[in-house]
Amino acid sequence: MVRPRLARLVTSFVATGALVFSAATAAHATAIGSTPVRTFEYSVGGMTMKVPTGCMFTHAIRGSGKRITYQNAGVDCAFVAALSSGFCNWRIDFTYADTNNRTYRTSRGRTHSECKIDPMRNNSPQRLPRYGKACAHLVVNGVRRVSQCHHITK
């Protein structure tokens, strides 16, 4: 259990290092990108929860053209962040927008009431009607906290 999480964490840090200067990447066949989750606080049942620095939101996508064969997004935390209570009342949404940045499809994830340090979601294969971008969004306690996108191009 620790080994797969460690491998995913290392992969997300390597991908982040490679993509630090680009917010979105072209998804011709495979793309993976990570975005740091900023520190934030939220309230659950009267308790204040704090997510410290040290978590990355990673979005992976595979396919060709407007056809997505695999899509996954999740959070990996390290150091002090890995010891926190994690994310409560979370969900991961996938959105698809055209080249004018108009969102035309949303796959809303189920809201999970339990607290989890490593939330993750797979999405079903998609055939998109147009080029643009595919994004994954982490929503915690009803507030979008972090997003990661890939451009879908010819």
PLM features: residue spans?
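Short, exposed beta-strand-loop hairpins at the edges of beta-sheets
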Residues: 125-129, 133-153
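Cysteine-centric signal of extracytoplasmic or virion-exposed proteins
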Residues: 55, 77, 88, 115, ...
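Short, surface-exposed binding/anchoring microloops in extracellular/periplasmic proteins
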Residues: 31-99
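Ribonuclease/tRNase effector modules and their secretory precursors
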Residues: 30-31, 50, 102, 130, ...
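Secreted/processed peptides and extracellular or luminal domains of membrane proteins
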Residues: 61, 83, 94, 120-124, ...
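Solvent-exposed serine/threonine-rich low-complexity stretches and specific carbohydrate-binding patches
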Residues: 100-117, 151-152
